[in-house]
A protein has these predicted regions:
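A short beta-loop-alpha structural element at the N-terminal edge
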Residues: 8-20
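Hydrophobic adenine-recognition pocket in adenosine-nucleotide-binding enzymes
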Residues: 12, 89-91, 124
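A conserved beta-strand-loop-helix scaffold within acyl/acetyltransferase catalytic domains
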Residues: 25-91
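Conserved acetyl-CoA-binding loop-helix of GNAT-fold acetyltransferases
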Residues: 88-91, 97-114, 133-137
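Conserved GNAT acetyl-CoA-binding A-motif
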Residues: 112-124
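Conserved beta-strand-loop-alpha-helix junction that forms the acyl-donor binding cleft
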Residues: 122-131, 148-158
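Conserved acetyl-CoA-binding loop of GNAT-fold acetyltransferases
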Residues: 135-145
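Acidic/histidine-enriched, glycine/proline-rich intrinsically disordered or flexible terminal extensions
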Residues: 153-184
Length: 184
C-alpha cells in the first residue's frame, strides 16, 4: 500500500523526540510532553543509535508536520521466539480515517526486512481495537491466546474470523469500571 497524495515518510533524526511525543499525545496515548519523553527514553535509549533505521514518521507534504509513526524495536529479551517487535504505532486523531494505516503497516514491514527481521511480534490493546482488527486483516496471528478477555472484547467489537475460538462479551465486560469511573 502506498501513502495517499500529500504525505511522505521520513526516518527519525535526533531531535524528533518531541514530535514523536506529540503524535502520541494527539492520538490519546500520553497526557503530557514530560510523560511522553520519559516513555520515549525508557523505551528507546537502549537502541537509540539504531532508531534512524527503525523509527519512521508519516509527514504532510504541505506543512512538514509529523502526523504518524511506527518503530521496529529490538527486544531486550525474545518474546515467543521473536527478537523484533512493532511498537508505538500511532496516527494523530485528526488524520485518522485518511487511509494512512495500511501504508504505515506496509512501511514498517519493509523496514523490518531491511533491518533483518523476517518475523515480528506486534503488541496491541483493546483501546485501539480498530488497529487490532487491521493487524489481523493484514495477516498477523494471535500468539498470546491465554489473554481471553482481550481477544473476546476484540471479537465483540469486530467479529473478526480469526477470533472464532473466542466468545463475545457483554458491554459491561468491555467497559471496565476502572476506566469509566468519574469522581466528583
Amino acid at each position: 500500500y502506498e501513502l495517499p497524495e500529500g504525505f511522505h515518510y521520513e526516518f527519525y533524526k535526533p531531535g524528533d523526540e518531541e514530535e514523536w511525543v506529540m503524535i502520541h499525545i494527539e492520538s490519546g496515548e500520553f497526557t503530557s510532553i514530560e510523560k511522553g519523553l520519559k516513555h520515549f527514553h525508557d523505551f528507546y535509549d537502549s537502541f537509540i543509535e539504531e532508531l534512524p533505521n527503525r523509527c519512521v514518521f508519516i509527514v504532510t507534504d504541505a506543512t512538514g508536520e509529523k502526523i504518524g509513526t511506527a518503530t521496529i524495536s529490538l527486544l531486550k529479551e525474545p518474546e515467543y521466539g521473536y527478537d523484533g517487535a512493532v511498537d508505538w504505532v500511532a496516527i494523530k486523531k485528526r488524520y485518522q480515517g485518511r487511509h494512512l494505516s495500511k501504508p504505515l503497516i506496509s512501511k514498517f514491514m519493509e523496514i523490518a526486512n531491511n533491518v533483518g527481521h523476517s518475523k515480528l511480534i506486534l503488541h496491541t490493546q483493546t483501546t485501539t481495537w480498530l488497529a487490532g482488527k487491521l493487524y489481523l486483516d493484514y495477516g498477523f496471528e494471535i500468539l498470546n491466546k491465554e489473554e481471553k478477555l482481550g481477544w473476546s472484547i476484540l471479537k465483540t467489537l469486530t467479529n473478526h474470523s480469526k477470533l472464532s475460538e473466542y466468545d463475545k462479551v457483554s458491554q459491561e465486560e468491555i467497559l471496565d469500571s476502572r476506566n469509566v469511573e468519574i469522581e466528583r
